[in-house]
Amino acid sequence: MAQTCDLCGRGPAFGNRISHAHNVTKRRWNINLQSVRALVNGAGRRMRVCTSCIRNNKVQKVA
């Protein structure tokens, strides 16, 4: 599925956009996904991973 992390499964957050006149429309906050070459079962594979997984060393990058 689009806009989800391949490691943790985290996706976008949903909420409302509220104007000064208090008109309410739906909006979404997308996560920061980066395309990374990672080691999966000993082979390099391209994955879409969120930056929190990269920062917490949950992905092992291919050199």
Swiss-Prot record:
GO cellular component: ribonucleoprotein complex; ribosome
Domain of life: Bacteria
Keyword annotations from UniProtKB, A to Z: Ribonucleoprotein, Ribosomal protein
SUPFAM superfamilies associated with the record: L28p-like
One Pfam family here: Ribosomal_L28
One GO BP annotation of this record: translation
Entry-linked InterPro entries: Bacterial_rp_bL28, Ribosomal_bL28, Ribosomal_bL28/bL31-like_sf, Ribosomal_bL28_bact-type, Ribosomal_bL28_sf
Any one GO molecular function term: structural constituent of ribosome
Annotated NCBIfam families: L28
Record family assignment: Belongs to the bacterial ribosomal protein bL28 family.
Name this protein carries in UniProt: Large ribosomal subunit protein bL28
Gene this chain is encoded by: rpmB
